[in-house]
Amino acid sequence: MNDSDSERGWRTRQEAFSGEEDSDEPTYFKYSATLRIFGTIPGHDELTGRLGIEPTHSHRAGERRSQNSEPYKHDMWSYTAPVNKHEPLHVHIDTLWSTFRTRKEYLLQLKKKVNVDVFLGYRSNCDHAGLEVPHTSLAIFLELEVPFGVSIIVT
């Protein structure tokens, strides 16, 4: 990359696909899988009791993340699979499903009153990579009748 390209903040196609990185920071990939239940939740404690699992995060509508942040618009109960962020995405998904598989019917009933989804996260400092999820790891989406979507953040 020449100096004028560097100043514009972009790389040639050859540089992008060569695996050369502009920084000395090692390439990383991080993943997560979270079951989210949100909307108007009458009782977080009751929900937690019925699921038999403590949420990794929860909040009520009107609460704030910090003093200067906007208030939350809805209640949230969420559980993130306890997997090392560097493990492949399918490990996160499989762990999440193994936690909630036996609670499927209750989650389907909940969907009639509140939103239930699976939030997948993919974060990397590499702008020329992808991810792969084996078909065997897609059962949670089929069984809970929720879309497969991934939040992708490249830093």
Predicted regions and their residues:
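Acidic (Asp/Glu-rich) sequence patches and key acidic residues
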Residues: M1-L131, H135-T136, E143-I153
